[in-house]
Amino acid sequence: MIFKNTRRSYQIIATFLRYGIDEIIPDIPFTYSARLTRKAFFWLQNEHKDQPFGVRLRLALQELGPVWIKLGQMLATRRDLFEPALADQLALLQDSVAPFDGKLARKIIEQALGNTLETWFDDFDEQALASASIAQVHTATFNKNQPLAGQNVVLKVIRPDIEHIIKADIALMYQLAKLIPYLSDDAKRLRATEVVREYEKTLLDELDLTREMANAIRLRNNFENSEMLYVPAMYPDFCHKNVIVMERIYGIPVSDIATLTENGTNMKLLAERGVQVFFTQVFRDSFFHADMHAGNIFVNPNHPEDPQYIGIDCGIVGTLNQNDKRYLAESFVAFFNRDYRRVALMHIESGWTPADTDVDAFEEAFRTVCEPIFAKPLAEISFGQVLLNLFNVARQFNMEVQPQLVLLQKTLLYIEGLGRQVYPALDLWQTAKPFLQKWLDQQVGFKAILRDLKQQAPQFREHFAQFPEAVFNALQQQKHINYRLAELNKTLQSQADNKTYNVKMIIMGSIILSLLWQFNSLPLWLSLPILTMLCLALCRRK
């Protein structure tokens, strides 16, 4: 194991050096050891000096394999952290790798299901239909012994040993992430350790296909009988951590504009429905498919005049709470109304930026960054870019990273890109505005109060039944507390009295000692009254 990790570490270092990635190491005292180590690998020189840094980084990640490719893809969506040219290069990374042996896939599936494939399926194709870094898919058909006999299905299987590879590479990423903040002030903004932690969670979640199954079932239920989106059925009886079985779909890739056009698809309606599907997930369901790139989205070839999307691969999803949704809706509406003070206050009220933030400076920062956007026609404004600008400004005012909103912003950029690819004249604002306005209207006013009361009525009934007992218990507790407080006051008063008495006795004792010391020298008429008074004082105390 140690040998494998050492060899992998050398492979990663050598790859970065051959592509000149080490040029980002600044000449400062802290990096002396890193620069010295670089000289130790003197035979590994930059072989691609004619290429810009972004291209070299993309090629290096591509060579390092699936785990690093997916990291680059994730970083490509963080345009709040990278220059546009670098983000554009990372976006070109393709998560496609050669499939592993179909016979091995068969063996893994049979081990998971507990019997031979022929027990349930006919026509299992050992040639993978598609292959990616985490898993690959094969086709089959339910045999005559199954209730869904003849149904075409897809079997998705996790790559063997991929978990070990991921964990080993992630461990190395953490080591690199610890060094990055010391490179420059800009590098500190990257928060590299947080990025790696977020990436690790995403990858490990994708390794558990039961999560994907649960996500797909939930999304399918949310859009049951919908004319906008169809999600393939899952077959839970055949689903395990490393294998899932789902309905096979037949659709046109959303990026295949030529075929969509040839099929007579209503492109304007298709583009608008893409935006509607996204905002429905966000504001109605608080649960959204967060990996809606072109490879996971298809279009139903039937009834092209009334187009319907087909969504697959629900391994990555996002969830939002009421605070998140209010932030999104009010920020977008305030932005389009050019109410930058409201935008600033939204960030502070949400608790994502410090309460002592200078609101005037915050407002002016938003105005400076956002106002130039309105040089474009309203229809051409990108919601994803608006969110990106808001995040960029907020980070300057110490906004805490909100992973769910970063995921949403990435998904929104995907949706916008696909929508404008399908129909370049898509007016995002007019398409999204009804969803935003409807949701905001539902959050205020008498109807909102009635809705909240209705939702909480079962809790009220449950708590009301327990109300008499709760009151009695509270009174008993209060009675006990009052008794304990009274006892405590007596104890404290007694301690205070004792303390006062002790002080007095110390003083009296001192006087007695001094008198006894000089008793023989005192006249009789003075000695007797003093002794009498001291005796009376002692008797009174007793």
UniProtKB/Swiss-Prot annotation:
GO biological process: regulation of ubiquinone biosynthetic process; ubiquinone biosynthetic process
Annotated GO MF terms: ATP binding; protein kinase activity
Annotated Protein kinase domain residues: 123-505
InterPro entries, per database record: ABC1_dom, Kinase-like_dom_sf, UbiB, UbiB_bact, UbiB_kinase
Residues involved in ATP binding: 129-137, 156
Identification of the protein by name: Probable protein kinase UbiB
Source taxon at top rank: Bacteria
Key word Membrane present: yes
A GO cellular-component term linked to this record: plasma membrane
Alphabetical keyword list: ATP-binding, Cell inner membrane, Cell membrane, Kinase, Membrane, Nucleotide-binding, Transferase, Transmembrane, Transmembrane helix, Ubiquinone biosynthesis
Subcellular localization: Cell inner membrane
Pathway it works in: Cofactor biosynthesis; ubiquinone biosynthesis [regulation]
HAMAP family reported in the protein's UniProt record: UbiB
Natural source organism: Haemophilus ducreyi (strain 35000HP / ATCC 700724)
Active-site annotation: 291
Function according to Swiss-Prot or TrEMBL: Is probably a protein kinase regulator of UbiI activity which is involved in aerobic coenzyme Q (ubiquinone) biosynthesis.
Chain ranges passing through the membrane: 506-526
Gene: ubiB
Membrane-protein topology: Single-pass membrane protein
Record Pfam families: ABC1
